[in-house]
Amino acid sequence: TKPYFDDQFGREIKWDLPLLGGYAHKSLKNFSPSPSSEFWGQINPGVIKEIVRNKPDLLLVYGWNSLTNWLAFVTAFCFGVPVVLHGENPLNQELLKNRIRLAIKRLILTPLFGCVSAFLYIGEENRKFYEYYGVPHKKLFLSPYAVENDRLIGAIDKPREGRGELRRRLGINEDGVVILFVGKLIDKKRPMDLLMAYENLKDSNKVLVFVGDGILKTALEKYVDERDVKNVHFVGFQNQTELPKFYAAADIFVLPSGVGETWGLVVNEAMCFSLPVIVSNMVGCGKSLVHHGQNGFIFELGNVEELTGFLDNLMADKNKLNSFGRESFKIVQRFSYKEDINGLLQALDYINNKNHL
């Protein structure tokens, strides 16, 4: 994959793990004058030719927020190719939209969903989203959002050995309780909520580590300097092979994101390292990965006082920290690529059985 400039990170990004190896692939030319993840940012008419020429047994489409996806839908429907739709929209965020927008969206999605053969949902809120728009239960198959559990878990021994080394490099003593944030420092992620909650903590052993870059970094650093908040570390963007060191050196993981955080794969990653996790009630993975009071806590979006209380609760009890971490590790085992494949295979079986009736 080629390096690219990420506006939200505010820097050029080149992932240090291969993303295109191990499978056949073909990239279609994008004719959009302004390529992006927006609707008009993906215009790949070549998808029509590919579907017509190959007439696949099944077409797997991720979302409906681009012209290319709609070209794929229409072509597949016209040529009798079954479509499996994979989306990520959580219902709790959907219901925050105004009634007029929801009504218009229902007019668009109802006929589209009626033509789709099967649906893959990533978690509980996403399943509820599909049901809200009238998708019958029999067409829904769980294909949870997952990360490379095996690679991350396999990296644990080596990073654990370097846990003390990384802490020493950052000036963190062995008794320090490290609270970790991983992600872009942007409005959607709400890192300031975490910084304010951290400031309120009374434990003198508290440490906060921000992994990532973004437009809010300057404001966060200014807040730390002006209010003399102790033991806050900004380590910048860390690539995929470096991240395990930071998860291994941490004690608690927090993702305080707001609307737009449809899942939060960094939570999966943190749980692979047996970390207790705290997320806001708008983080899409919350109801699937965070079992409140068992492996972490879910706080009301923007409620800094509640977040502070949950952090205090964990930091005051070392045994709870450890038991929550063990529970996180157990839970994330059910969110793996194997489960993704099982969901797709179940959808295929459903389509084949339906076609043979």
Where do the language-model regions lie?
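Nucleotide-sugar donor phosphate/pyrophosphate-binding loop at the beta->alpha transition
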Residues: P82-H86, P90-C115
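A short, well-ordered alpha-helix in the C-terminal region of glycosyltransferases
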Residues: R168, E306, N313, K320-R334, ...
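Conserved donor-binding/catalytic core segment of Leloir-type glycosyltransferases
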Residues: N173-K189, L195-Y198, V209
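Nucleotide-activated donor-binding/catalytic signature segment of Leloir-type glycosyltransferases, i.e.
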Residues: T218-Q238
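Short alpha-helical donor nucleotide-sugar binding micro-motif in glycosyltransferases
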Residues: F237-Q238, K245-A250
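Short hydrophobic beta-strand element within catalytic cores of glycosyltransferases
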Residues: P276-S280, V290
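Acidic donor-binding loop of glycosyltransferase active sites
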Residues: A248-T262, L275
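Donor nucleotide-sugar binding/catalytic pocket of nucleotide-sugar-dependent glycosyltransferases
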Residues: L109-G164, F234
